[in-house]
């Protein structure tokens, strides 16, 4: 009996030690920046105006926004942009200016834990939950409704932004008039296992820490950026961009996998706007993210199963993940403009 107790105690101790070694934190190079309160600048770019503001989220976090719109012109619609992983709002300035010159207002925002949307409780690389990320986007939609009265809202999500954009539809599809996605992330069955592993890392290493095993398994923050685009100039810009994140903490990775896991949970979608026009634009060389032809068909089928009737998928040949930063980006810009002008 005594030996049995020793074995049990030893087993518990061994399990605890193994958990510590597996999920222990490693130092990370993310530096906390101070958030600046309220309005920053207003500039004029040819026939376009640009204004940087801070919108206060429900928990007090200042969300950094850039509003780009046509000067002295009526606004056709307002495009709400949700960026992808590791990046920031200013990477969409080129597309936003193009759309503004064509009559659209564009709201760029740094998702919390990215760019300038940070504070002591929300450091760089931290996304606390899917719900919180969606609440922020709903706050931005309300801001648009208040400042652009009677203008339709077009939601645009790139990469993980396309995941959040689809989850936004669950209860809020009646708030938008169109949905655009690029670098459209496929549903992956392994996401549910990723969530379990990440939750264990949260438990044993702490939500705000950086577990080496999570970093290894997720590969978020790889230094190889050639998969983004065929345009070497754009790849170099990413590598030299000090605003790009090196990775995510444990709760950030949990949120990423949890978002992907929910894409197939059809029961979560109310589908109050079944005729919502939805367009996905991807690159044929972006198979790892989109799942290629098989993954894109699955994405389209899922949206139609939910109840959306107008789902269009465009897969450009010889393009990679960031289609708006490809060598022939003009073709993509025009495709987006045509969709918004319909």
Label each region the model flagged:
Residues 304-342:
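Catalytic active-site module of serine/aspartate enzymes centered on a nucleophile-bearing elbow/loop
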Residues 163-248:
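Alpha/beta-hydrolase-fold enzymes
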Residues 2-24:
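Hydrophobic alpha-helical topogenic segments used for membrane insertion/localization
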Residues 280-282:
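Short beta-strand/loop motif that positions the catalytic acidic residue
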Residues 89, 96-121:
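Conserved alpha/beta-hydrolase
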Residues 81-87, 159, 284-285:
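Active-site glycine-rich loops that stabilize anionic/oxyanionic intermediates
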Residues 34-70:
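N-terminal cap/lid segment of alpha/beta-hydrolase-fold proteins
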Residues 126-145:
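Alpha/beta-hydrolase active-site loop
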